[in-house]
Amino acid sequence: MASSLAAQLAQIAANSRTSLNAKALKATHSKSLIWEPRVAAGQTFAEIYQLSYEGFEELCNLDARFAQYGASLFSEQSQEADRIQMNAEENAVLDKRVDSFLHLVGSRLRLMPAIKAIEWLIRRFRSLTAPPRAAIVQQATNRPELLSVISQYTLESCRARQEYPGLVSFWGGVMAEAANGMLDKMRSGRRSIQLENDHILLQQIGPVLSEAMVMKEVPGIQIASYMIVTILAAKGSLNDVALTAFMDQLVHGWNIDTYRPGLVCLCILAQHRAAKQVSSRIAKALIKVQDLVPTLVEISRQHRVDKLANGLALAFIERLSKKGDVRSLPAINSLLSANLLRDKQIKVIYKSMLLAAHKVNDEVDEDGHIRKEIGSSLISLSQTGGDVGDVIRSAIEEVDFNIEELELKLGAAIRPKLAIEQSSEEAGAEEGAMAVENTLSLASTFQELAKLQPSTVSCLSQDSSGLFNDLCAVLLSAAAAESDMEKFDSIPALSRPLATSNPFYLSFYMRVWCGPFPTLAKVAALERVKLRLKESDCADKDFQAIIPYCAVALSDPAKKVRRAAADLIAVLGSLVKEQTRQVWGAKDLYGKVGAPNALDRDTLKALVSSVLVPSLEESVLHEAHVVAVLVSALESSKGSSGTEGGRRHLSHATRLSIFKFICGHVTETPLLAVKIRLLRSLNQIRSISGTSRTDLLLPLLRWWAALGHEEVIELTARESLDEATVDQAVVDVIIANHAAGLETAFELINDPKTALRPHLVQAIFCRVIKMWPSMKSDTKSSTARFMFNITQTLSSSEHGPVITEAVELLRKVELTTDIQLDLIDSLQDQVKLATEKPANKRRRVSTTEQSRSVGLQSNPELKAALNKTTFVLELVQESDPANHPELLPSLFTTLSDLHHLSTLIGSELGYLQNLVLSSLLAMMPAYKDNKNLTIDASVGHGDILATCIQKSSSPAVINAALLLVASLARTAPDVVLQSVMPIFTFMGSSEVIPPLIDTFRRRGRNVVASTKDLLASFVTAYEHIPSHRKHDLFISLVQNLGPEDFLFAILAMFVDRYAATDNMISFTTQMMSSFSVEIQLQTLIKLLDLTSDIFKPKPSLSNVLLGGDGSEHDTQKVATKQLNLLPHLLANKRLKREITQLAERDDMETGKIRDLYATLLESILTLATTVKNKKALYNRCGDALSNLLNLLSIAEFIKSVEALLDRPNVGLRQKVLRALELRVDSESTADPRSREALLAFLPQLTAVIRESDDMSYKHTAVTCVDKISEKYGKKDLDAVAAAAATIAGDYCLGQSSQTLRVMALLCLASLVDVLQDGIVPVLPVAIPKALDYLEQSLVGEEPNAELHNAAYAFVAALAQHIPYMITGSYLDRLLACSNASAAAALDDESSSNRTHCLQFLAKLVDPKVMYNALNQNWASASSCGASAVSEYLDILGMALDKHSKAAVAKNVASLSTIFLSAMDLRRTVVSGQAKTAISPSELGEIETKIGDDALKMIYKLNDAAFRPIFSKLMEWASTGLPKNDASGRTLRLFAVYGFLDTFFGNLKSIVTSYASYIVESAVQVLSSTNFQDADEKELWKWVLRTLGKCFEHDQDGFWQAPAHFGAVAPVLVEQFLNAGAADATEDLIPALVELAAAADSQEHHKELNGTLLKHLRNGQAAVRLAVVQCQQALTVRLGEEWLQALPEMLPYISELQDDDDEVVERENRRWIVEIEEKLGESLDSMLQ
């Protein structure tokens, strides 16, 4: 009961926030920012609140945002707030307010009002100080959540604009150190793990850096993030994706203040990135930077910039070629000329410029300006002098480039001229003809044309080609000059004046701009028509027939053509606005036929004004836009009527009129290009108001299909079109479910002429395939029936391509269940007709069975039936039978018909039967998943399958039938209930299985792989076999098959299918136990071989037996199932018992079992090596190995593996020893047989260590020795000692392998524990080598931590058990190594091992040896830096702690020398005598430790022993250096007075008398201080602090003595004259106040007061102010005792009331207030 109550009380105390410990409460209350703890402990909350509220009010005056906290944290009620009384929710709210206040006040932490306000938070709300920086960094490195909290705090402050340099500097430093530490911690030698670690690190700190880099208002945090990103790039293995992301984010967020450091960061990131162009975002940002190249040149003096410059230049070139950004050209030129790039990079960039020059086209450079600029740059760069010019010229030679040719190619006027000359068919003039001759030739041509009269009404008629070609040739020659074009336009043959009534003029130009002619000619044609339509005689005409051709021009690839077409449409739009009536070309536009389906005025206006004109600008930009516009206008616009403001909704009638209008022109125009381009839009319109495109365009398809092959070739060649493209466009006019269209398509397919045009045939079938998903069910059925009939009825010689396409169509489209049923049902009639003949004829032919079979085989009808059946069944199999389970009854019927047919023709028809069976098998999952699908059990499907199995000789058919039976057994057991067991009985008998196996063996095939499907059928049927028959049935099966070959396969397939469940483990274990031990071990070996086969690049047997898709996940899943079974099989108690019995017999059979055991062990070890990277599988191998090792006793195990240890394969021998190591771990220490066997094996292990040359093998042997010795070593010390000698010798510890050395040292450390004094003979060899290796481990850039730790472990064991063996010379070397180790900044584990060892040494080694070694080692420690010195002092302190007073007193000489050297450290460091620099902060920490260690020594000395040391110290500090070394003396005194401050502060009144030794020195320092020297000024402060401590703790009247008081007091008062150079309030005033309190004499007070009052009339305001503040402090501290001299003070006080300095005057008033408070009366009357 009492214990229960105590436990409850302990739990309550642990969870309680209330403490009843008065000392603890007082200590908590005394924590203050402002006051000493002893002062703070006596303060009330009201006093603290009053002072803190004053500071809060001042903060509110500085920043109004603080006012909000006046009602919460600084309210009157806050004095009553007590965290102990608050609940968790209230404390959380309070924490949130405190955190918010600290965010805001953070930037003002150095202001006194802020300190006062925070004082209230600390005292009232217990908001304590933060942990030291080193702890923060260490925790942030190891705990990412802390780093995240610090980062979020900093980012929140920055978002709220509450940041300040201290916060940003703190975050940047911690983040940088933490990132560096995390990179070191996550470093791995394996690439995959390293990549994963880098990914994790980026996930942890990447988002923080990403946000920090874009805080443009906080440049400091951006620069800090640049530093951290640089560390990540330099030390982390970041890929290019991450580096590019950081670079993009950097340029996204930089500004004018951060672009320079950002550019440096970019350079560093680029150097760690692959040499490729930077992203477009970076290029876009850098192109805006002023003086980019000069800045890069400046940066290149300190950092490599070549990769950034290279990537930037390539990105600029890409922008130039794709976007025409010529701003980047000067930057590219400057980068190439600035010597920032290597020769290879210069070549690549220049060649890229050449390529860009050729890529720039009219879309990027319409006026040729960009090409001219590029050409100028290329030429100027090629003429550059120096090395850069040489490299560029060599690049030009490599690409065989001609600068003059480039000038020509980049000229703006060259390309159009060349295009005209190359495109004209009549350009027959010689290449060297002069321009004058060309002009004369063109003039004569015009004269000839003037006599020519048009022979046709329109150039769009069928008979206009000759005249059009002649005129077109002249046009192409005249298009280059406007004057020539004017002459051409006016020739009589064109009939320009008659253009409104005669369509020849306009139709000529229409045909030109729609034809395959140069861009300039098309533009000229469009311009001519535009100018003509602007004339007055065109105002009363309706030129709607031109609109389709304008739409064609709007889809031209050339932008100039589209622009000219847009201008022409705009003119047409202006004509439409007029009241026009007469339609141009209405009668003769196409010769005898006029323009079809003319539009009325409103429809025309809607087409032009609402459809075409609003989209002209977009159509000019994109050639496909006009197609989309027409489709959008013609389609039903319910949802798009308001999408574009410039277009209005078109009515059904309007859209139908436009649709018919365009279709009419498509049908009538002779130009294929016009047809094709307009069909792009029309073929996207299904129908309008019931009128489909097929209705209107079917004549076009018939016309095109009626053309002969030669005519098609001629037409397409004339217009430079692809025949297949035209075929497809024309055929696409057919829509799904259109009866006439489909009928036309079917007629064309059946037409023999169509077969001569394969492209057209292919287009028709492609169209049917495309329409198939949109067809109705009956249409699909009729189409499929038609296609199927084609494949069966047409002649392959005449319609070969058609039949091929029909077959492909049926294979590609998704055949519905009804279609497939129709096809299958047609087979039954076909087979019936083919096999049944009239009775008399059948009797006449079938005289014998053989003759009947021959007759049927020669029957063409039967052959056709077989072909048809084959095709149908292939279609069914390819149509995913799983989705058509309704076919199952028909397929079973077909299978039955095939059996009947096979008996007639004398062939098994195995292929056809296999098709049916595979389709049926695919349907089984559907019947299993869908309960609505049922199989009729009365039909006899099982009998059919049994027939397949029993009568077929095809293995494929038998296997498929067995699989189907197994599936039916799971899905519909009733179907095969009567048939499945006869099948098993039949297959299990000796009539089939043995012959089958023999056949496979004779053919040299793998019998297991060949019978895989057979085995699978039995495994599948396992769950349907009665439980009482399962064991016997499968035992019989395995015995018939042969257990040595098939038992492992059965087991593997069982566990693969049903997993290693409890039932399956029990069943398989029973099966295994039914066979001999030899068979069981062989089976286990083969199981392991099968599992190993899974992981081969090309699995063989495992892929056959276990399947799998080859993926990593699937492979691991399959292997896991197998390895889950293996440990259970090995754990079989019966197997272990039988093996144990055999081992006791020790005969030949036992030897065979040992061999199999060794092979099994080898297989497990090999497999474990294979799956080492897969944790789950590796663990399963470990379980199996554990169970295998337990099968034999350790003695038998060693006998079994002896053969393996004799193998030449060193890797195998090493694995065997590792297995032995595992077995040793599991052995009991109490088993004598195991102990004897293992100790007897030690000599063999030492022999391995001596004789083997393989280091890994030696390493494993040493590990085994370590394990055996640790467990059994104390039972046979001689054997262990022999092993220790071997390990310490040259064969092991003396080897060059680092890992072996590490293991040897660790093993020796264990052997020291076992042997203790018995290992002494080995140590003269082992200790020097250990120290040598320790020294080697610290040499080089990367210290060897493992060797380092092992050496320290060995030495630590020696120090713990036999410390007397560590002599002075060994200790000197060890301490020197420890200094180097401390300076090397190793990981935590290494540092812990080192300090652990040194702690043992400090505690256990003889003190004289230890202190002498430390004395001799000081120089080494100080030369290694702060870390080594700090650790040195820690060890010294521990050595002082652990040894007695007598030991310390005996070695005081060595210790005093150590402390004198230590106190001289500051001087040696500052003067540069130290080899390693130590920062001032580190020096401060070291001197604090020196003081602490000195106190530890002092505590163990008496006064008689220590006083001479103290005297010597002061003498050494004051006179130990030459007189001319003033700075050295100052630094030495600095350290000494730092110690004295600690000395007097800790020992207090005990050592007051020691102050007599420092008076002279202190007076000298105070009298001679040069305040311009920072060191002397700081020493001055230390002296005052030390004196203050002496005065404060004087309890013996030491300073009342006139000699002591008189020596110090005048000098102290004289220091007020230095108030202008130093702050008197910090140290001087407290010291003087303490002196006055210690003096405690009226005479001394009068002397002090008189001297101080004299300084009140000093001319310096700072002196007067300091004295007034000193008087205030004296008044407060001494009260009336000091105010006895008030009469002397009053005149001075009165004078100070009118002082020239306001501050002095204000402080004087405060002094008066203090006096009045002490006296209790006013001074006004006295001062008057």
Swiss-Prot record:
Q: What is this protein called?
A: U3 small nucleolar RNA-associated protein 10
Q: What is this protein's function per UniProt?
A: Involved in nucleolar processing of pre-18S ribosomal RNA. Involved in ribosome biosynthesis.
Q: Which UniProt keywords apply?
A: Nucleus, Repeat, Ribonucleoprotein, Ribosome biogenesis, rRNA processing
Q: Which domain of life is it from?
A: Eukaryota
Annotated HEAT repeats reside at 540-578, 881-926, 986-1024, 1191-1229, 1235-1274, 1622-1662, 1683-1721
- Enumerate the subcellular locations listed in this protein's record, separating them with semicolons: Nucleus, Nucleolus
- Which InterPro entries does its entry note? ARM-like, ARM-type_fold, BP28_C_dom, HEAT_Utp10/HEAT1, U3snoRNP10_N, UTP10
Q: Which residues form the signal peptide?
A: none
* Subunit field text: Component of the ribosomal small subunit (SSU) processome.
Which cellular component terms (GO) are annotated to the entry?
Answer: 90S preribosome; small-subunit processome; t-UTP complex
The record's annotation in SMART domains points to: BP28CT (SM01036)
The organism named in the record is Chaetomium globosum (strain ATCC 6205 / CBS 148.51 / DSM 1962 / NBRC 6347 / NRRL 1970) (Soil fungus)
**Ranges that cross the membrane:** none
A GO MF annotation of the entry reads:
snoRNA binding
- Homology family: Belongs to the HEATR1/UTP10 family.
| GO BP, one annotated term | maturation of SSU-rRNA from tricistronic rRNA transcript (SSU-rRNA, 5.8S rRNA, LSU-rRNA)
